[in-house]
Amino acid sequence: MTKATTLFYIMSFLIASVCNGQQKQLKMENKINNPLLCDPETGVCEIPTAQKTNDNEIVSDQKKPVKIIYFTDPICSSCWGIEPQLRKLKLEYGNNIEIDYRMGGLLPNWSYNSGGISKPSDVAHHWDEVSLYYDMPIDGDIWLENPLNSSYPPSIAFKAAQMQDETKAVQFMRRIREMVFLEKKNITLWEHISKAASETGLDAVKLKTDYETKAIELFEADLELAKNMGVRGFPTLFFIDSQNNKQMVYGF
């Protein structure tokens, strides 16, 4: 299979998934101005202030025919919704793709009031609706019982995990998402981050050290890259071939 053919089939796979998702019908209030209110019709957790500043930011260095740069966030409900498709993509095209996971910083803090959201409890009902739409288990009660004040801590922890092992870092991301979406755990708390690290074979002590130092810089670099590439929300995937040609899939 040629590189061009590989890219074509992979893009077709993702575009079909996007179209199938957008064909579902669900009536929800239009609150997508707030990033925590992901729009099921487009599959996007929006970043209202994102602006594109540099279209040539990425230089491809992949060893496989296609590199996918995946901008995501640990508490992005649409990103949780795309998990089955992403796993299928890896199973069908794993020999031809490599995925570069990047953090986008969905929720810096609660110092804003946008799109009908002013406090964590406003998100609870929305997550329940998203669960029905994607047919993925999500328990919105986390926002009533033990709400998160930011998505930055688990994002930085993921960058620290990547410093140890890329494969284990992906497993770590899956685990902390299970914690927040299924188990109602506040994954900004170190006790849960440390537990997820240990369960996925990471060195929790080293993770803590990196989390407090180098991982912060790596996370900030991801935010800058997202800004430069014009990422407006999550999930966003850039498909790049060996000639540095790019295609973007936005939403789900």
Q: Model-predicted segments: where are they?
A:
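Short N-terminal binding/cap micro-motifs at the start of the first secondary-structure element
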Residues: 45, 77-79, 110
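Local sequence-structure signature of Cys/Sec-based thiol-disulfide redox active-site neighborhoods
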Residues: 59-88, 99
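C-terminal cap of thioredoxin/glutaredoxin-like
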Residues: 34-48, 71-72, 83-91, 175-252
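Boundary at the C-terminal end of the N-terminal hydrophobic targeting segment
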Residues: 19-21
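Structural alpha/beta surface segment adjacent to cysteine/selenocysteine redox centers
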Residues: 83-184, 189-190
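A short beta-strand-turn-helix
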Residues: 44-66
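Bacterial N-terminal signal peptides that target proteins for export
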Residues: 1-7
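Bacterial N-terminal signal peptides
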Residues: 9-16
